[in-house]
Every structure is written in C-alpha cells, then in structure tokens.
Regions:
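N-terminal phosphate-binding or glycine-rich loops at protein starts, especially the Walker A/P-loop
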Residues: 34-83
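Short, ordered loop/turn segments at secondary-structure junctions
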Residues: 46-49, 75-81, 110-111, 140-142, ...
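Short Gly/Thr/Asp-enriched flexible loops that form oxyanion-binding sites at enzyme active sites
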Residues: 55-60, 141-155, 215
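Short, acidic/small-residue loops that bind anionic groups at enzyme active sites
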Residues: 69-73, 150-183, 228-235
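Accessory alpha-helical/coil subdomains and C-terminal extensions
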Residues: 137-139, 147-149, 177-201, 205-302
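Short glycine-rich or small-residue beta-strand-to-loop segments that form or flank ligand, phosphate
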Residues: 40-48, 104-109, 134-137, 202-205, ...
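C-terminal non-catalytic interaction/assembly regions of soluble proteins
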Residues: 280, 284-381
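Glycine-rich oxoanion-binding loops at beta->alpha junctions
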Residues: 22-34, 82-137, 142-143, 175-186, ...
Length: 381
C-alpha cells in the first residue's frame, strides 16, 4: 500500500507499467499499437449526482494524460454507458473549466450492471471492445458495490467514493457532503426568520437514506430545535413535548430537521406506504416531512409547515473543501491504476488519502454513532 498523503500533497511518481498486476491484466496483443506503460482507462460516474464529480474526472484526465500519457475513455450515464457501448475519449480540452461545475459531464444513472444474467459478460465484452486496461468507477454504495463484485470476478477496477450522504464505511468523508451540509444550513438560516416572524413550526426534510449525517451537521450548524435521523427511531410525543416546551418559554416557533430515512418508533404514528424501488432495490424516499407536519399540528395545535430541500442539496458549485478532496481522490485513483492496484478505492483516513480494498469500502455503512447524536440533544427544545 502506498504511503499516506495529505490533501495538498502529491504522491511520489510511480513507475508506470512495472506492476505485475497490470501486466497480468493485459494479454499480449490486447490492443494494436500498445506501448509498455501507456494504458487505456475507462471512467464512469454512477448513482445520484453530487458536487465534486467533475473535479474527480478533471484530475483523472489531467494527470492520466499529462503525467502518464494514458488514454481516458468516459462512459455516458454510469453503468448504462458500459452496457450500451456509449463512450467517448476524454482529452485535456474536454475537462477545461469543469472544476467549479456541479453535476457530472459524463451523466449518471442508477443502472445495476449485474441485475440481469449475463451482466458480467457484457461488462467484460465492452472493456474488450473499447480495448480498455481497466475502469475507474466513481460512485456510492450501489455503484461501488457492483464494482466490488466485478473486481472479485477479475475485472480490473479502481473506485472513488461519492455520496452527499457521507455513509460509505471505507472512508472518513465523501466529497459532496460538505456542499450538501452548507446548502441545508443556508436554507435553515433563512427559514428561521420566517418561522419566527409567523410564529409557526417548520419541518425541514433533508437527504439521508440510511445515515443522518446531513441532518445532524446542518441541524447543529443551523440551530435546529429538533433533529431526527434514521439511526434513532423517534417518539412523536417527545418531539411534540420539545416544541411545547419552547412555546411555554415564549419561543413561538421551532425548526425540526428530519432526514428522509428517519422513522418513528413502531406503532406511534402513521407511516408512508410502499414506495417505488430502483434497480438496486432501494425505495425512493421522501414524504416523512409532510407526515411530521400533520402529526405536530394535530397534536399541538400549532401551525406547522414543511420544506423539502430535495435535489437542491445535490446541485450547484461544490465548496472549496469538496473540490480539493475530489481532486485528491482522482489523483490517487489514477496513481492506483498506473501502479496496477486493482480492486482498491481512494479513501480519506484521518488527514490523509490512501487506498483501501473495495471489499472493505462497501462492507458496511458509516452511520451516526449514538453518542454523537446524544451530544446534540442538549440543543433540542
């Protein structure tokens, strides 16, 4: 494993093409005009978009082409592009000016390449058709989960973690999270003034399917009066008690921040019905804010409204932190490819970026520890 490096520190120059694992992944005559040490690498972005994706692509292309002389091929719309043979060569010119842009120039989708029988063979065939030496896969738990399975089947893959939810277990932080928290905090700050002016409660629904990191951090930063997260089923009676306590103290408004995946203690209030599911089997979440609005108003008699931040958390320009972290992940990924360190993922561990195995990266989700949520409780009510 290479030595760790800080967010502003480049790795020592690896010797391209010398790794035995790289050599093993390329059969003789794999592609016409092959030059030892020069690779042809595919890159894709899968799952929900988030700020910082373009910074990763830019770093992969800039260092891959400028420093190593590799050819970089981008697949359109994630794994769908691999299955549908939708690819284009990425050049230095094609990544100019994309650093501050949100979204992804490659497009994305929630396509599961292994959903149907024959998916593995289709991926292998596409790599052969494009004469690729390997793939850099940028994604969250589902996209990287598919990458880990492909890697275990012998497909040469290096991963880059991406999710605004910050819930990948293999890394301390994912890019996009910082931007999402800033967007949510700005919204909470604005909603405070209108809530106070009209003496009403406001429920702010933020993203977070399995983990409440966005809700917790934006709620703390925005001075929320109640924060509800997926890791801790909530008691609606306790939520109402906290709001009533504020009113008894002359504070005739409250901000309730709730993650979309938060659920009540079983049997304490109505819940959402079955939602449609994506190709990875996850339900499309959303709606807990509206249910809370109804329950709080009907139980307390206080006017309550809901604001669902939704996809605004994914959009727009990334923060400086996310640009730097995404850039370092991209640089680490192209180094890993050049060194033949297949089956790994760039990860932030403490202050430094290093490589972890894909298997380790997707083994478990990174959720909010109970003690961290309990510490925040001192600000509730």
């Amino acid at each position: 494993m290479p030595a760790r490096r800080g967010l502003g520190e480049l790795s020592p120059e690896p010797q391209p093409g010398t790794s035995s694992s790289v050599a093993a992944s390329r059969a003789a005559g794999r592609r016409e005009g092959y030059v030892p040490g020069i690779l042809r690498i595919g890159v894709l972005t899968g799952g929900g978009d988030c700020p910082g994706l373009n910074a990763v692509i830019r770093a992969v292309v800039r260092k891959g082409v400028d420093r190593y002389g590799h050819a970089i091929v981008g697949f359109r719309d994630g794994w769908r592009g691999v299955l549908d043979d939708a690819a284009e060569e990425l050049t230095i010119e094609s990544v100019r000016g994309i650093l501050p842009r949100g979204g992804t120039i490659l497009g994305s989708s929630r396509t599961n390449p292994l959903k149907d029988d024959g998916g593995l063979d289709r991926v292998r065939d596409e790599l052969e058709r494009q004469k690729l030496d390997g793939l850099i896969v940028i994604g969250g738990e589902d996209t990287l989960g598919a990458a880990a399975k492909l890697s275990s089947a012998g497909v040469p893959v290096v991963g880059v973690p991406k999710t605004i939810d910050n819930d990948l277990g293999g890394t301390d932080r994912t890019f996009g999270f910082d931007t999402a928290v800033q967007v949510a905090t700005d919204a909470i700050d604005r909603l405070h003034t209108t809530a106070e002016s009209h003496h009403r409660n406001l429920v702010v629904e933020v993203m977070g399917r399995h983990a409440g990191w966005i809700a917790l951090h934006s709620g703390l930063a925005g001075g929320a009066d109640v924060i509800l997260i997926p890791e801790r089923p909530f008691d609606i009676d306790e939520v109402c008690r906290l709001i009533q306590r504020r009113h008894s103290r002359g504070r005739y408004f409250a901000i309730v921040v709730v993650a979309e995946g938060a659920t009540p203690v079983e049997g304490t209030m109505a819940t959402l019905g079955e939602n449609p599911r994506d190709e990875f089997g996850h339900p499309r979440l959303g709606g807990i804010g509206q249910i809370l609005e109804h329950e709080i108003e009907s139980r307390t008699g206080y006017e309550t409204r809901t604001t669902v931040l939704g996809h605004v958390q994914r959009g727009g320009t990334p923060t400086a932190y996310d640009r730097v972290l995404a850039t370092q992940f991209g640089l680490t990924a192209i180094d890993a490819v050049t060194e033949g360190r297949w089956g790994t993922m760039a990860a932030l561990r403490g202050p430094r970026v290093e490589l972890v195995t894909l298997e380790e990266a997707v083994a478990q989700l990174r959720t909010v520890p109970p003690e961290e949520y309990e510490q925040a409780g001192v600000f509730f009510g």
